[in-house]
Every structure is written in structure tokens, then in C-alpha cells.
A protein has these predicted regions:
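Thr-Gly-centered strand-to-loop micro-motif
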Residues: 99-101
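C-terminal alpha-helical cap/extension of soluble enzyme domains
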Residues: 106-167
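Alpha/beta enzyme core
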Residues: 1-95, 107-116, 123, 135-137, ...
């Protein structure tokens, strides 16, 4: 389960995540939480290693999404990830690290991040774009009998767009 309370102050984030983590663990589920704020655009707040360690110890989460310079959505330019910060986080935090906002970050940045301790990448924006491209191609192929299309046809076309992004 992803618990994102990263917009909240540290104390409130930790308290809510701790309570929800207890419930999730009681049901046999793992928990990923976010500390620092992976924003839309340039408003992000970097994850501090000392806070990250305290957060993990206090909440009992199984994985931690860290903010090292990525953002949700599209980028104007390739982001400059704070690899020195990632190294500190990797050496400080005792659970797997997650990188949100990986779409558009660039293959080299992602490879380096993974080699330095990122265990999971989120790249949804590129996949959404691929799905929309697949939909647009399907829509363009429809004639006046468009009402006869089947939902699974649309799904197949959107999935093809996602696969094209993954390749």
C-alpha cells in the first residue's frame, strides 16, 4: 500500500503513516510511504537523511519513497538528481528506497539511481502518455460506425501504446 502524506508536516505525516502501517501489517500487507515531497514541477522538498531514518523507525514502513530531485508529470528539461543525497539516504535508511517521478528522468539517471540504491521506480506519466497515444490511433481508425467498438478493443490499443513506451 502506498501512503502518501508527504504534504503534511513531518510529525503529522509520521503519526498517520504509523497508524495506517499497523493496520496494513495486521492484514499482511506491506507499506510504502513518501517523505520529502515529489511535487508537480519545481516545488519539491528534498528528503533529509536524519528525518528519513527517524520516520522509518517511528512508522515501521517497509519501503520509503524519497525526494532527490524528481517531480510527478512532465519535465521541461531533464532533472538534475541529487545523487549525493541518494547516497546518504541509502547509507542511513534501513528499508528499500523508491523513486517517484521517474518518467522523463532519462535512462542514465534511472540506471545510476538504481545502481546507488533505488529499489523501485515509478514511471506512470510515460505509460499514461503511451495509453493516450494508443487511444488516439484507435480513434483515428474508426469510421461512422464508431458506436460498434468494443471496450476490449480500446484496451488492447491502449495497452499497445504502453508496450511501445516500455520498449
Amino acid at each position: 500500500i502506498l501512503l502518501d502524506r508527504s504534504k503534511l508536516p513531518f510529525e503529522k505525516n509520521a503519526a498517520q503513516v504509523k497508524e495506517l502501517t499497523k493496520i496494513a501489517h495486521a492484514c499482511g500487507m506491506g507499506v510504502e510511504a513518501e517523505l520529502g515531497h515529489v511535487a508537480m514541477g519545481d516545488e519539491g522538498v528534498f528528503t533529509r537523511p536524519d528525518e528519513a531514518k527517524a520516520f522509518v523507525e517511528e512508522t515501521g514502513v517497509d519501503a520509503l519513497a524519497v525526494a532527490i530531485g524528481t517531480a510527478h508529470g512532465a519535465y521541461k528539461d531533464t532533472p538534475k538528481l541529487q545523487f549525493d543525497l541518494l547516497e546518504q539516504l541509502r547509507d542511513t535508511v534501513p528499508v528499500p528506497l523508491v523513486l517517484h517521478g521517474g518518467s522523463g528522468t532519462g535512462d542514465e539517471n534511472l540506471k545510476k539511481a538504481c545502481s546507488m540504491g533505488i529499489n523501485k521506480l515509478n514511471v506512470a506519466y510515460e505509460l499514461y502518455t503511451g495509453a493516450i497515444d494508443g487511444y488516439k490511433a484507435y480513434e483515428a481508425s474508426l469510421d461512422e460506425k464508431w458506436r460498434t467498438w468494443a471496450p476490449y478493443d480500446l484496451y488492447d490499443k491502449m495497452q499497445a501504446g504502453i508496450k511501445a513506451v516500455a520498449e
